[in-house]
Amino acid sequence: MSAPSPEDILSFLTDNTSLTILKFLDEKEYSTQQIASNLEIPLSSAYRKVNKLEQLKIIKKTKIIRKMDGTDESFYTSWIDEVQINFKNNRITCKIKNKEHQDKIVRLWQGFRHN
C-alpha cells in the first residue's frame, strides 16, 4: 500500500473518535473489543476506525491471539511518534515519523514494570 495522502491524515486528525483511539493505544496494546468497551463507543464503529487507522499506518497490529472458541483476536498499538502537516505553495504535504520498533521481549518487560 502506498503512503497515506495528506488529506487522509488531515481527515484522521479532525476525527475525535480516531484521536481518542490513538491516544488510548499510545502506551499499551488493546483489542478492538477492549477499545470499544473502554472508550464506550459502539463495537462496529471501533472496528471501522481501527481498520482505517491501520490502513493509514497510524496504528499497528502487534499480535493475534486464538481464543478458546476458535476466533482470532487482534491487538493494536500506536505506530506514530510525530505527524507534520505543511501547506506551502498551495500544496499540502505530510510527514509521519513512526515509533522505533521494539523487540517483543522489551515490550513485555516494560509491561511488567508498569504494572
Spans of model-derived segments:
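Glycine-centered, phosphate/nucleic-acid-interacting loop/turn motifs that mediate DNA/RNA or nucleotide
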Residues: 57, 63
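Short, locally clustered residues in the helix-turn-helix/winged-helix DNA-binding domain
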Residues: 14, 23-27
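Amphipathic alpha-helical dimerization/coiled-coil segments
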Residues: 81-115
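A short acidic, leucine-rich amphipathic alpha-helix
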Residues: 21, 34-38, 53
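The DNA-contacting recognition helix of HTH DNA-binding domains
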Residues: 18, 43-44
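Short, cationic-aromatic polyanion-contact patches
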Residues: 6-17, 31, 64-87
